[in-house]
Structure formats: C-alpha cells, structure tokens
C-alpha cells in the first residue's frame, strides 16, 4: 500500500511539469527529495520545448530569455557590381585533352592570340622607360636590372589577362614563352658563355616563379604587403630609401587599375598595352584608354 502511494505521488509530481510556450510551471516546494530529483531530470526536455515555441524560461529570482534573436548578414553586392573572371563552358572532350596538356578550342584563333601576346610582351620591353627606373629607383644599368623591370611589367600583364578565361590563360603562357626566348637571345647577343647562360636561365626561372607568387600575394593585400614583395624581389632586399618603395607601390597600383579599365577582347585581339609614367606630371590624367584600332590584314 505504501509503495502504491509513492508511485501515485511521483506521477502527480511529473504531471505538474506541463510545457507551455512561454514558461514552465514550477513544482511546489512541499514535495520530497525523490520528487525533486525526478522533477530536475525532467526539466531538460521541457526547456527544449519552450525554446522551440519561442518562449522564455521562468526561474524564481532569475529572468532568462531563451528566444534569442540571431544576427542575419545583409546581402552583399552581386557579381554584376564587380568584374569577375570569365567562366567558359567546356565539354568533356575539351577537359580531357587539356588534362593531358593540350589546348582545346578557344574563343578566338590561336594564331591571333599568339600575335597579340607577342605585341603585349613587346610593349613591356619597348614602351617601358628603363632609364627612368634606373634613375629614380637608383638601380644599376645591368642585364639583371632590365630583367627585374621587365618581369614586373610582364606580371602585371599576366594579372590582367588571367581574367579573360581560357583564352587569357593561353595568352599568358605565350607571353611567358616569348619572354624566355627574348632573355635567351639577349644573352647570346651579349656573348655570354652557353654553359653560364643555361645555368643563369635556371636561376632566373626560379626567381620568376618566386616573384610571381610574391607579387600575387602583395597585390591582394594592403600596401604593406605589396611593399614587402617589391622589397624582396624588385630591390633584392637592398632599398635604403623608403620613398623608392612608396613610388613603386603607387606605380603598381595605378598601373593595375589602368589595365583593368582596358577592354578584354581588345587585349586578346591586339595586345596593345600602354604604360603610365613612373611619376605622374598630372595625376588627373589617368583616364580610360581609347579603344585600339584593329588591323586584321597585318595579323
């Protein structure tokens, strides 16, 4: 009989915990130790139900709100607001042959892209004022200094053309190919020993890929990161005047912005690139470049 009375008391205490959306009804304090233990163990599922209903838990002396309002991030600007790399749809066959190291069909003719790449590299060499770099950056007039300046401008062209999809990436490979052909030819004209030239070509190749990684990291970071990349690569960690770094950081930033303003299709078909001066006489003169004139007969 006593056991039956205890069971009935326990059922009564449990039934008093009725979940309500706004709060939980507390148990009367006159219950025994066994009833309190059962009531404490039954609190967790009831609390989860009150959270699901969006209510709050009422505890004597403590007011805890369980229905928290979570922060929702506002929608950022769409991809239409900022230029994005061109994504081309390619078939399975194209993916297979490109995975094997071959180049699939492109948007434009490959021989036109090759000629445009040659023109773009030529603009890096012929349209750059090397004497101004030697003077303002206090660089010696040597073959290594010429290579560092050319490398910087070739990298800026690669950054721009990688935004033009598969055709732009193909053009980047051709630009780099023409650069190494030119470096090797200049070494032969200077009368460098073939063995020494081959050894130096390996060193310059390693320096080229290290510089590309450093410049890419610098252009994606702030001016401190870009200045560090230029100090390590362009100045070979030998720049005593910080104004030279400041000048070069400004030059790279404005030149990248200037190249981004050029039409991608025009660059793929003509390869015509113009460079801003190292020191601007009129800072307001940085305007959108004129569209180039096409000459299909000469292609």
Swiss-Prot record:
InterPro entries for the chain: Ubiq_cyt_c_chap, Ubiqinol_cyt_c_chaperone_CPB3
Organism domain of life: Eukaryota
Function in brief: Required for the assembly of the ubiquinol-cytochrome c reductase complex (mitochondrial respiratory chain complex III or cytochrome b-c1 complex). Involved in cytochrome b translation and/or stability.
Lineage: Eukaryota, Metazoa, Chordata, Craniata, Vertebrata
Gene: UQCC1
A Pfam family assignment: Ubiq_cyt_C_chap
Record annotation: effect of changing residue 44 to S: In a breast cancer sample; somatic mutation
Keywords: Cytoplasmic vesicle, Membrane, Mitochondrion, Mitochondrion inner membrane
Keyword Membrane among UniProt keywords: yes
A GO CC annotation given for this chain: cytoplasmic vesicle
A biological-process GO annotation: mitochondrial respiratory chain complex III assembly
Family, as annotated: Belongs to the CBP3 family.
Protein name stated in the entry: Ubiquinol-cytochrome c reductase complex assembly factor 1
Protein location: Mitochondrion inner membrane; Cytoplasmic vesicle
């Amino acid at each position: 009989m006593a056991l039956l009375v205890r069971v009935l008391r326990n059922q009564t205490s449990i039934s008093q915990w009725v979940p309500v959306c706004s709060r939980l009804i507390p148990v009367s304090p006159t219950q025994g130790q066994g009833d309190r233990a059962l009531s404490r163990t039954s609190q967790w599922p009831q609390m989860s139900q009150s959270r699901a209903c969006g209510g709050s838990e009422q505890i004597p002396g403590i007011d805890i709100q369980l229905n928290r309002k979570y922060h929702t991030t506002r929608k950022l600007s769409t991809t239409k607001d900022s230029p994005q790399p061109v994504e081309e749809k390619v078939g399975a066959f194209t993916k297979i042959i490109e995975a094997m190291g071959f180049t699939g069909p492109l948007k434009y003719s490959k021989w036109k892209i090759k000629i445009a790449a040659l023109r773009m590299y030529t603009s890096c060499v012929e349209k750059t004022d090397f004497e101004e770099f030697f003077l303002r950056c206090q660089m010696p007039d040597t073959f290594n200094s010429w290579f560092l300046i050319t490398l910087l401008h070739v990298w800026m062209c690669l950054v721009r053309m990688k935004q033009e999809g598969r055709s732009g990436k193909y053009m980047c490979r051709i630009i780099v190919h023409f650069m190494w052909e030119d470096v090797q030819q200049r070494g032969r004209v200077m009368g460098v020993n073939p063995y020494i030239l081959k050894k130096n070509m390996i060193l310059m190749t390693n320096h080229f890929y290290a510089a590309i990684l450093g410049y890419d990291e610098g252009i994606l970071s702030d001016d401190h990161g870009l200045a560090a990349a230029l100090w390590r690569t362009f100045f070979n960690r030998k720049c005593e005047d910080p104004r030279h770094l400041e000048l070069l950081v400004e030059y790279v930033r404005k030149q990248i912005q200037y190249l981004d303003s050029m039409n991608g299709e025009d660059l793929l078909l003509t390869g015509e690139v113009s460079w801003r001066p190292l020191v601007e006489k009129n800072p307001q003169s940085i305007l959108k470049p004129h569209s180039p004139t096409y000459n299909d007969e000469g292609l």
